[in-house]
Curated annotation (Swiss-Prot):
Residues annotated for GTP 2 binding in this entry: 430-437, 466-470, 535-538
Membrane topology: Single-pass type IV membrane protein
Source organism per UniProt: Neurospora crassa (strain ATCC 24698 / 74-OR23-1A / CBS 708.71 / DSM 1257 / FGSC 987)
Family designation: Belongs to the mitochondrial Rho GTPase family.
Protein name listed in UniProt: Mitochondrial Rho GTPase 1
PANTHER family registered for this protein in UniProt: EF-HAND CALCIUM-BINDING DOMAIN-CONTAINING PROTEIN 7
GO terms assigned for molecular function: calcium ion binding; GTP binding; GTPase activity
Residue stretches spanning the membrane: 601-621
Entry-linked Pfam families: EF_assoc_1, EF_assoc_2, Ras
Gene, per the UniProt record: gem-1
GO biological process: heme transport; mitochondrion inheritance; mitochondrion organization; mitochondrion-endoplasmic reticulum membrane tethering; phospholipid homeostasis; regulation of mitochondrion organization
Record-listed GTP 1 binding positions: 11-18, 59-63, 115-118
Amino acid sequence: MSTAVRICVCGDEGTGKSSLIASLVKGVFVANKIQAVLPQVTIPPTTGTPENVTTTIVDTSARPQDRTTLRKEIRKSNVILLVYSDHYSYERVALFWMPYFRSLGVNVPVVLCANKSDLVSDGNAAQVAEEEMLPVMAEFREIDSCIRTSAKEQKNVIEVFYLCQKAVTHPIAPLFDYKEGQLKPACVDALRRIFFLSDKDQDGYLNDQEMQDFQQKSFDKPLSQEDLDNIKLTVSKSVPSSSTDKGLDLRGFLQLNKLYAEKGRHETIWIILRKYHYTDSLSLEDSFLHPRFDVPDYASAELSPAGYRFFMDLFLTFDKDNDGGLNDRELAALFAPTPGLPHSWAETSFPSTTVRNEAGHITLQGWLAQWSMTTFLEPKTTLEYLAYLGFETPNARETTTAALKITKPRKRRRRPGRVDRNVVLCYILGSSGAGKSSLLDVFLNRPFDTLYHPTIKPRQAVNSVELQGGKQCYLILEELGELEPAILENQAKLDACDLICYAYDSSEPDSFSHIVELRKRYPQLDELPAVYTALKADRDKTTQRSELQPDAYTAALNMSAPLHVSVTWNSISELFVALAEAATNPSTAFPRSEEPPADRASLYMALGATACAALAAFMIWRRSTSNAA
């Protein structure tokens, strides 16, 4: 919204432009002759101006020799006050002034002012408005409003400049189409989203309590029962087919705002829109969608308890049939106030990335897991959708970042102990056909598919895992597909990864050699904790064509032997627990052959302390010897 308003006062000579400005500044009519063009006037923000903006008023001359200055001032302004005072100057509004503004290519609102109304009897006021102003407004849509004034009688002097201010701070053009007599599509979309967010129980109606909450949020004051009844009465008269017994439905809500626009109360609509973070172009504020949220190196983003509670409540609200899953219709309703599914979700074939029920609908467990993964991989996407979906905090100063938290950096992975993470990422590396995709399927409780489907694009799967002691964490398994070389050469990708799972087919003789070659080709993998896994253990085990067999290879690294598992075994869940445990306690899973280097800092501190103690003992001995002598 504009924080400064520049008003260019235009009109024929003798219409009273300068007198209007002087009367506003002095507060009284200036009877003495004043200069033809007044100097620029700046009015500082006061409680009487809309949104407390700074207003600059520029007087102009209509003389041909001043046309260059006039053009310059019109182009610099963001609202034009066009003044006429008699029949001749009125005719010039349509014949000269409005076409002239258009020829300059300016796109600013115009406030039409019929000045010197003291020369017209009050009985003719309505006739003047109907016969003069309305036809011009109908012909030139850029005319925002019209008003009759008198500088001599101080009639509507303050009001005319207030209209100019409001034409900039609360423009009607983005909201209402006078030609069609309807709210504009962008305005309807914004109001529809606001209705959606206000309808907390999603029953299609704003009940009395929801109306009260909406009123308090929008206008910071309660709604009296009388005002509420009047709103319902107004809507029922305007839309006879809209019942208000259950509350205000979407149709009635839109009609109410349409009435505000028709009656010149579009300021009310703007107050509502801006409380819900809409800009003058009716898009959501970028700072609202994308608040500052920096994740330090080696740290990660996760949902906070408030974030998990919000997404859980959202799921329960839209699971209308209470079957424990969100079907396509329920998902569409949930994402109605957003641009649709997040781009990354669509790219990864959501909801195939998480837990679904037998009908293929995402469950609450899968829903929370999906948002946990999104927050870990793309925290800015989560923040954007929290804004779209209406996340709110009790503290008005807090942003959507209150729904997220940042974990402690885990730069030193070799340090013993658990990392401060509830969401961890594990890359599954192995040869084609080793069973990586089947591993992801069974992780999401999918049935085993005997057909081989090669993985082209990276594929992710996320689910919750219960660690030893009962703590829950979210484990993200990612198969890299054909992008494996690019990802393994990307240090930022490796820094984000918590664990490598080297998987090979224990029934295929050439499968393990792929892992050996992979570790030689990418030595940086040695900096990541790792778990070795022998898949397809339900088949006959075969000797691997490798210099060392898997057990001997891992023993040479002082690591645990490969875990032998099969996706057809019920015990497969133990593998996921082992992966989550290794990811959250990385010092137990490092692929290295030498013992960890001594902690030299501790050694130096110990030596320093010993030296200090020895020096102190020597000084005490020397002093006692001196005293004895």
